[in-house]
Amino acid sequence: MKLIIAEKNDAARQIAERLSTGKPKKDKVYNTAIYRFEWKGEECVTIGLAGHILAPDFCDSVLFDKKLGWYSVTEDGEMLPADMPDGLARPPYDTKRKPFLADGISIKGWKLESLPYLTWAPVIKLPAEKELIRSLKNLAKKSDSVIIATDFDREGELIGSDALNKVREVAPDLPVARAQYSSFTKAEITHAFDNLVSLDQNLADAGESRQHIDLIWGAVLTRYLTLAKFGGFGNVRSAGRVQTPTLALVVERERERMAFVPEDYWQIRGMGAAQGAAEDDRFKIAHKTARFTDKDAAETAYGHVDGVATATVAAVTKRSRKQQPPTPFATTSLQAAAAAEGISPARTMRIAESLYMAGLISYPRVDNTVYPATLDLGAVVSDLAKINPALAPVCKKVLAGPMKPTRGKVETTDHPPIYPTGEGDPSTLDGGQRKLYDLIARRFLATLMGPATIENTKLELDVNGEPFVASGDVLVTPGFREAYPYGLKRDEQMPPLEQGDTVDVFDIKLEAKQTEPPARYSQGKLVQEMEKRGLGTKSTRASIIERLYAVRYLKNDPVEPSQLGIAIIDALSQFAPRITSPDMTSELDGDMTRVERGEDTEEHVVTHSRALLAGVLDELLKHTQELGDAISDAVTADARVGACPKCGKDLVMKTSAKTRGSFIGCMGWPDCDVTYPVPSGVKVSPLEGEAAVCPECGAPRIKCQPFRQKAFEICVNPTCPTNYEPDLKVGECKVCAEAGRHGDLIAHKSEKSGKRFIRCTNYDDCGVSYPLPARGKLEATGETCPECGAPIVVVNTARGPWRICVNMDCPTKEKKPARGRKTATKASTAKKTTAAKKTAAKKTTAKKATAAKKTTAKKTTTKKSTTKKTVADK
């Protein structure tokens, strides 16, 4: 059996459908969907991953031994050497307070003292998708060979390499090959699997270099900024090697705007028309001196034309110019063009990925702007005409004329520019998908068409001795504009006038104006500026901008830095300017490119980045107090959610020192003890204007943003009438019935925590309780689950009614493993059992458990095993 590993389930399905001699059979291994089919007389199976199946992380501590030196230990006993600088203090330490341990340093908790050690801590790879890994190994044991068919780029090659390492754990001698493709067309997939190549380990190493460097820099800088001014309130202050200089670009532009000193100028403008023309045929006229910088001169000129009703045409000039067709889309140019149409870069990439997975467009993460000679452009145009009737007339013209594609400045051999494949059914696409697909399809056609011809007519007018001008452009020959109208200005048709003709003039006015500061970046322009400065990659720039919005460093579009974003950059620029400069990030990205080319090694590049970070951190730690003071006001403002209804002081987001949970508390504490719970699993932000204060109780109202769900607004006061939900009987308790007593199961919302649950009226005796979704109107059905006997309820949400069994341990839910907290039907017994198991587990951990509490830790990749030592070896 041949095992084919794709990056996602949709990709696995597409590959199976394209290669299969018949219809692929959908199957399951454990809980993972797979596709079985026959190809060239051989049994094949495709499995789709969920992106990265391994995630980089740190062990819980770094330890020191006089003979072994510094090291970390994973749960399975593997010892990873840590190349700590000699200047870092070694145990024994004068204090036993965390992060200091008897034999090392704890790096699990967020402590400033641990950051120099975290900078040099070994990186381990933990299973991010246990079920997928389990299924992958199961298939590998039954396979004769494996084909890696993940996306062909750094991330895809790393995903494939990680998957292969898991395969090697159970099938070390399995032959492996690589399929490289740029779209899910049958021809492309068939060609890729007929021409298999080897896995590019250099490319995978470059991807892992970026992964490790981003983890190390992000963890150290984020912890530092958060700890520098925490005080138990506010959000985590995110930072990173790319996002920080990107934020600095926006703040730098904002500083330019704030420092801008406007200058006064004056303009004289009005309207003109051929004599007797209708009002709709009027055209704009302006004084030949576009801007008067002298007010007296402007008023003198205006005095000559004020009230004048006619002008004489002094000259008529016509000129034609060619507008060249655009170059093919690469990722950045697509994001910029889509942003101009109202689609953010991050959303553009999500939509483009869905179009790619559906087989409608080619691979969307590319730098290439030159179509390869192997791409049959005519065939793509012909296919495009068949599936898209609206573009058929343009496609026909493209096929009839000379087809000479434009060329951009960047030519690579990995993937072609982004183009429509000519397959699929565009009519099934929704609004955003259709809008982006049309942009891509029309851009592709435009790159194959000729230039547009634009004719400009310029009129020079004499208005009572003062020179005026009027100008208008008309599209004479559409050329590529017939396919690609984006950004095209409306025709400004000038009347057919000749020298000496008289025209009427109207509404001539003198306008006082001021020069404008530099414009803020749009998201599209910011992506282009990041590319220009060497910040991020084609695959990461959009997500970096999205991240800056998520942590509230940026707001609005055009992009504007928040008070906190400005404070962070100002402080870092003062105490560690290298972090905010794009030069260091560009240098590290260049190092990764050398790894990709085989000119450098992953180990050397990551070590170099650690050294750079260590120097930056050393400077920051010297100025922690000053930096904390510099961002203090902004941190407080960022944490604020409203005014306390009791004392009027600020209510802010706080974090409990004991539970690490979030809540809203008053800045007047301890004199004022007002606190409110915060819904779990959401990002909280304040509302503005009238919506910010609850009309019922006067407490603040907040916006809650769940992960990848629709945001909702609530009053922070759980006892507020707007949050009240009446108790609802949903059934009778099965456990109580078996014990010979009656108990009702009641759906209830806690006034203290805001959480919803179902609990028996005899809970103290039976311990029966079930969790409920945080949102959605509940309806009792009176029915019970045939499998477990728990109540069946209906939850009405914006996405529709959901009929569910409330028991999270119900056998019917085994097909989809429950995530998050499990519910025990016999709570008191279950809690004791769980506690006993945890206690036993703690007692049986290895001697070095303080350094390795991550139960899922796995050995790092085979290719590096020669550099690692085990405890047994020592």
Predicted features and spans:
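Basic, low-complexity terminal or inter-domain segments flanking catalytic cores
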Residues: 2-3, 35, 166, 222, ...
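Short glycine-centered, acidic/aromatic-flanked micro-motifs in structured strand/loop junctions
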Residues: 150-152, 336-338, 365
